[in-house]
């Protein structure tokens, strides 16, 4: 069983913003596998389904981003999911737009949502899909809560689809295979 967590902020004003990439990827997976994310529990919205023979729980925490760990630990404990089977998808400013990076473990890299998840899991050993949003030329908060330009949106939509495939690959083939397949790929217009 896998827990697939997309990080984002709840509310219409945050829809399609850079910081909501995790929610967007989870929505793509939900659509592909006909999983309704319509249940409220674990301080978030979730749905259950399958990828092949593997049961998955899709979770969108409704806590503030920097408290995402509260939602993740509740769901992981309820379903008794190993840390190695918790996949977290989130935006990353240290990666260029058009790229993603799959990792099996690692530090928070300055992302407060990931920092909180590491704290609650008491471990940094969980797979993650880091989606590049690029470096801001402006205030960081305004940047991550801002929307992509039209040109960027074209690229990001393709990267979101690729990120969903990377998550599916982690479930079906393992982290190493997903890393080999998706790390280093760059999408351009």
UniProtKB/Swiss-Prot annotation:
GO cellular component term, pick one: cytoplasm
Classification via SUPFAM superfamilies: Peptidyl-tRNA hydrolase-like
Active site (catalytic residues): 19
GO biological process: protein quality control for misfolded or incompletely synthesized proteins; rescue of stalled ribosome
Reaction equations catalysed: an N-acyl-L-alpha-aminoacyl-tRNA + H2O = an N-acyl-L-amino acid + a tRNA + H(+)
Annotated site location: Stabilizes the basic form of H active site to accept a proton: 91
Source organism superkingdom: Bacteria
PROSITE patterns: PEPT_TRNA_HYDROL_1, PEPT_TRNA_HYDROL_2
Subcellular location: Cytoplasm
Alphabetical UniProt keywords: Cytoplasm, Hydrolase, RNA-binding, tRNA-binding
Coiled coil: none
Residues at the site labelled Discriminates between blocked and unblocked aminoacyl-tRNA: 9
Keyword rRNA-binding belongs to the record: no
EC number(s) recorded for this UniProt protein: 3.1.1.29
Enzyme class, UniProt record, top EC level: hydrolase
Record keyword Cytoplasm present: yes
InterPro entries per record: Pept_tRNA_hydro, Pept_tRNA_hydro_CS, Pept_tRNA_hydro_sf
Function of the molecule: Hydrolyzes ribosome-free peptidyl-tRNAs (with 1 or more amino acids incorporated), which drop off the ribosome during protein synthesis, or as a result of ribosome stalling.
Protein family: Belongs to the PTH family.
Subunit structure: Monomer.
Protein name per UniProt: Peptidyl-tRNA hydrolase
Organism: Clostridium botulinum (strain Okra / Type B1)
């Amino acid at each position: 069983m896998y827990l697939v967590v997309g990080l984002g902020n709840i509310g219409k004003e945050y829809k399609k913003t850079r910081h909501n990439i995790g929610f967007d990827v989870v929505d793509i997976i939900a659509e592909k596998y006909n999983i309704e994310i319509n249940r409220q529990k674990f301080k978030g919205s979730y749905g259950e389904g399958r990828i092949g023979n593997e049961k998955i729980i899709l979770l969108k925490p409704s806590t503030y981003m920097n408290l995402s760990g509260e939602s993740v630990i509740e769901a992981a404990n309820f379903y008794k999911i190993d840390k190695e089977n918790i996949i977290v998808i989130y935006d990353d400013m240290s990666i260029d737009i058009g790229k993603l990076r799959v990792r099996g473990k690692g530090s928070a890299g300055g992302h407060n949502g990931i920092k909180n998840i590491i704290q609650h899991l008491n471990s940094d050993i969980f797979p993650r899909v880091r989606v590049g949003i690029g470096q801001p030329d402006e205030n960081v908060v305004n940047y991550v809560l801002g929307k992509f330009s039209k040109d960027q949106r074209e690229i990001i939509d393709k990267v979101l689809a690729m990120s969903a495939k990377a998550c599916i690959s982690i479930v079906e083939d393992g982290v190493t295979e997903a890393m080999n397949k998706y790390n280093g790929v760059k999408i351009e217009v």
